[in-house]
Amino acid sequence: MAHPAQLGLQDATSPVMEELITFHDHALMAMSLISLLVLYALFSTLTTKMTNTNITDAQEMETIWTILPAIILVLIAFPSLRILYMTDEVNNPSFTIKSIGHQWYWTYEYTDYGGLIFNSYMLPPLFLNPGDLRLLEVDNRVVLPIEAPVRMMITSQDVLHSWTIPTLGLKTDAVPGRLNQTVFTATRPGVYYGQCSEICGANHSFMPIVAELIPLKIFEMGPVFTL
């Protein structure tokens, strides 16, 4: 989860998030080198008199500053496209769970367990226990298994929402009248937090998501312990 004054990304809990962190570092390195090169060129131009007003063209230089950026863009685009297609893959999910956004709470439906349905509301500050996180705790957590592909079917009943858990690398829009899906495989047990990431009205900031990831064997006993 996130920590105060944190500068980096949250620890990955899924292969997709691990790939996103690697790509972030890859792209950040490329952008840092480009920024340093541009700043060096600007500084050199301002502090030296290495100018020549008689030069009308420099085809070699123009070729370099056309081909080099193109190569850099390709090196950034390929890993980006790989992750993009990886997030869209749906390969025989073991479980399907439906998430419905409302103003301003979530409804979860376990379609593989007799259609178990429950709502998940944010806990008001008066109901928090010592150690609980303000604006992030809910009354009913969504319980998910680890080490098994899970498909989340996400939609909305009223306005646009977005079901997001950063540590899993998940962010899927909940659109009224449309059913979006995302598949993920969690790798570590724990409790992970997210929030609605689409401005959805006055209480948009009070619409948290809490996922409790547990071993597959325990999950297969039935998700009734979420209530």
UniProtKB/Swiss-Prot annotation:
Its cofactor is Cu cation. Coiled coil: none annotated. Cu cation A1 binds at residues 161, 196, 200, 207. Its EC number is 7.1.1.9. Component of the cytochrome c oxidase, the last enzyme in the mitochondrial electron transport chain which drives oxidative phosphorylation. The respiratory chain contains 3 multisubunit complexes succinate dehydrogenase (complex II, CII), ubiquinol-cytochrome c oxidoreductase (cytochrome b-c1 complex, complex III, CIII) and cytochrome c oxidase (complex IV, CIV), that cooperate to transfer electrons derived from NADH and succinate to molecular oxygen, creating an electrochemical gradient over the inner membrane that drives transmembrane transport and the ATP synthase. This is Cytochrome c oxidase subunit 2. It holds the Pfam family COX2_TM. Residues 46-59 are mitochondrial matrix. Cu cation A2 binds at residues 196, 198, 200, 204. GO terms for biological process: ATP synthesis coupled electron transport. PANTHER family: CYTOCHROME C OXIDASE SUBUNIT 2, CYTOCHROME C OXIDASE, SUBUNIT II. It catalyses: 4 Fe(II)-[cytochrome c] + O2 + 8 H(+)(in) = 4 Fe(III)-[cytochrome c] + 2 H2O + 4 H(+)(out). It comes from the Eukaryota. The chain crosses the membrane at residues 15-45, 60-87. InterPro entries: CcO_II, CcO_II-like_C, CcO_II_C, Copper_CuA, Cupredoxin, Cyt_c_oxidase_su2, Cyt_c_oxidase_su2_TM_dom, Cyt_c_oxidase_su2_TM_sf. It is a multi-pass membrane protein. It is found in: Mitochondrion inner membrane. GO terms for cellular component: mitochondrial inner membrane; mitochondrion; respiratory chain complex IV. Gene3D superfamilies: 1.10.287.90, Cupredoxins - blue copper proteins (2.60.40.420). Belongs to the cytochrome c oxidase subunit 2 family.
